Amino acid sequence: MRTPIIAGNWKMNNTISESLKLIEELKPLVKDAKAEVVVAPTAVSLETVVNATKGSNIKVAAQNAHFEESGAFTGEISLKALEELGVSYVILGHSERRQYFNETDCALNKKVKAAFAHNITPILCCGETLEEREANVTNEVTGKQIKLDLAGLSAEQAAKVVIAYEPIWAIGTGKTATDEQANETIGAIRKTVEVMFGKEVAEKVRIQYGGSVKPNTIKAQMAKPEIDGALVGGASLKAADFAAIVNF
């Protein structure tokens, strides 16, 4: 049985003080959650949020990282530094990173491996554009991303990866994939993992849905057999909304 995982991606929102306020509001609301709870604040708020969540059931994710341990990479953050900070997860390959910062699958593969080298679990994002969905190539697109991004991992590592399926056309638009579409695509992603690493690994991998997840959508989404959680954007910025999703 896979433990559900609900992660809140705060994106470029919340100052340090606002992040602390949100965490303090959130802690009592999710303390009895059956799902694993993760929040991803901005880089400047990471240390504050890590310290504020100590002793709670909330884990902390970074929103991105570089694959090199150190060097002349102005503005980047190393996984080595994130490990020392006490970060548990790192979001990799979010569609905004792929789209606005030209992240490639080659770089993401290096990042996934570097995350494991520093005991940080990747939340690996994949998804298709509206054009790709309408051309009926969703499974080809996500399958290719997964094959490239997870290439060279051991079965043990692959089983720990969290995958987030996020149809790009549903992010921040208010549109969502139907529960059936999400379940079907996530099933196809799981099949790709099975082909790469075997059935046992595929059955362990947790795959989230991301794309305008709200308190009024989560219950039906989580009722689908392939969906193991959610990567939540805007709704994670309000403690009550995010708690309602966590406590689906």
UniProtKB/Swiss-Prot annotation:
Pathway field: Carbohydrate biosynthesis; gluconeogenesis; Carbohydrate degradation; glycolysis; D-glyceraldehyde 3-phosphate from glycerone phosphate: step 1/1
Gene Ontology MF term list: triose-phosphate isomerase activity
Keyword ATP-binding: no
Coiled coil: none
Subcellular location(s) per record: Cytoplasm
Entry EC number(s): 5.3.1.1
Gene Ontology cellular component annotations, sorted alphabetically: cytosol
Binding site for substrate: N9, W10, K11, G172, S212, G233, G234
Function: Involved in the gluconeogenesis. Catalyzes stereospecifically the conversion of dihydroxyacetone phosphate (DHAP) to D-glyceraldehyde-3-phosphate (G3P).
Family: Belongs to the triosephosphate isomerase family.
Self-association state and partner proteins as the record states: Homodimer.
Listed NCBIfam families: tim
Name of the molecule in the record: Triosephosphate isomerase
Source lineage: Bacteria, Bacillati, Bacillota, Clostridia, Eubacteriales
